[in-house]
Amino acid sequence: MKIEYLGHSCFRITDENGVSLLTDPYSGVGYELPPRLCADIVTVSHGHFDHNATHLVKAEKVINAVGMYETNGVKVVGIPSYHDEKYGALRGENVVFKWEMDGLTICHFGDLGEPCNASLVEKIGKTDILLIPVGGRYTIDAKGAKQFVDAIAPNIVIPMHYKPADGTIDITDAEEFLGFFDGVLRVGDAPVHITADEVTKGRKIIFMERKH
């Protein structure tokens, strides 16, 4: 599969058959999505402007709620969670999305803010590739993200929702989170290609940057 990081919490993941899933399209974060974006499936973790700009993406199917879905041969599960450490009292609910492509399970945390807990970890279950926020303030921070990584034990971890070098959004960069791990693979703004064989080689932390 091919993983492209488009900034903030937005990725486009394309399987070997050409089916694409795009997560949390954004607006109003100080930089813009690439123009003329297309995807077969779009997931939206919650209704805030920096995660639900579906009008900027040409998509066949938008999924924005808890539940089980199947479209274009991809099974998607929306898992209930919360946007803040007070379990929704501050910023409401959030949907963690998990799906399978090319025999691998991918989990996107959206704007998860609730602390690591056994109930949510159990609902998420086995995960090969974890896309996780690390910037704090509106989501879990670096330490909170590390706790989830330790609890879920994914094979590949890609941080998101951090302040980029040219960003103005009031969250932190990814360096504290990356500092918890050895051998971080920094790929710049290049897409990442992952096969099932790669996930058997031990945990890998991949730091992706938005293409300017």
Where are these regions (language model features)?
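P-loop/Walker A phosphate-binding loop and immediately adjacent motor/lid segment at beta-alpha junctions
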Residues: I3-S9, T54-P80, G88-L90, K146-M160, ...
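Pre-active-site segment of Zn-dependent metallo-hydrolases
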Residues: C10-G47, H51-V66, V77-N94, L112-K123
